[in-house]
Amino acid sequence: MKKFTKILSLSTLLFLAGCQSVLNEPTEVQQPGVQIPHNDAQWQQHLQQLAKIQSYSAKGQIGYISPEERFSSHFDWQYRTPANFGLELSSNLSSKSLKLHRNVRGLTISDSEGNSRSDRDMDSLMKEIIGVAFPIDQFAYWLKGQPEQDGNYIVNDKRQLSQFSYHINGEVWKASYVQYHEDRQPNLPKLIVLENGSQTLKIRVDQWAF
């Protein structure tokens, strides 16, 4: 636990030193005036295009807001398979970094000072980090704007995922998709807001590659 405490301390230093612009992005998202049914042909075609993106990377900024603190960081997400993906958080103002790596043995969190923590139970480890259960294995789909097939979600008139809710271990995460990169096909998210009670994650994706 001592090493894990060091990781948390480092992550706080990393985030506080990072760029703050993503924290100023809008968070209020109104439900679309027109909600497209889930069996809409164009929406189903969009889902098929998203499903074909099985290995990809995304880079941008991530911000965290709670009543106690606000911080942000650059992120680099590399996804290969459900059992092989990684997330690196870093600042352009320091050499500190925090990495999450998933392999067949579970999830490992490590920092640039050599501290690390591993656990096969990824949800429990994520709860230790941010205080609530966070399904990191679902993040790959959330980032693409790809909901669960039978999930509770809303589609806007542009055939883009607008909102959804996800239940995990008694916790509820609500996701709102504020902006999309509409200059490419399929349209991929540009700004996502994830909320769980008083905690908010803002994710701005600046670069997609697949």
Swiss-Prot record:
Keywords: Cell outer membrane, Chaperone, Lipoprotein, Membrane, Palmitate, Protein transport, Signal, Transport
Lipidation, S-diacylglycerol cysteine type: C19
InterPro entries assigned to the protein according to its UniProt record, in alphabetical order: LolA/LolB/LppX, OM_lipoprot_LolB
Annotated membrane topology: Lipid-anchor
Subcellular location as annotated: Cell outer membrane
SUPFAM superfamilies attached to this UniProt entry: Prokaryotic lipoproteins and lipoprotein localization factors (SSF89392)
Record-linked CDD domains: LolB (cd16326)
Family annotation (Pfam families): LolB (PF03550)
Lipid-substituted positions (N-palmitoyl cysteine): C19
Biological process according to GO: lipoprotein localization to outer membrane; protein transport
Location, primary (coarse class): membrane
Superkingdom in the source lineage: Bacteria
NCBIfam families cross-referenced by the UniProt entry: lolB
Task of the protein: Plays a critical role in the incorporation of lipoproteins in the outer membrane after they are released by the LolA protein.
UniProt family annotation: Belongs to the LolB family.
This protein's name: Outer-membrane lipoprotein LolB
Gene assigned in the entry: lolB
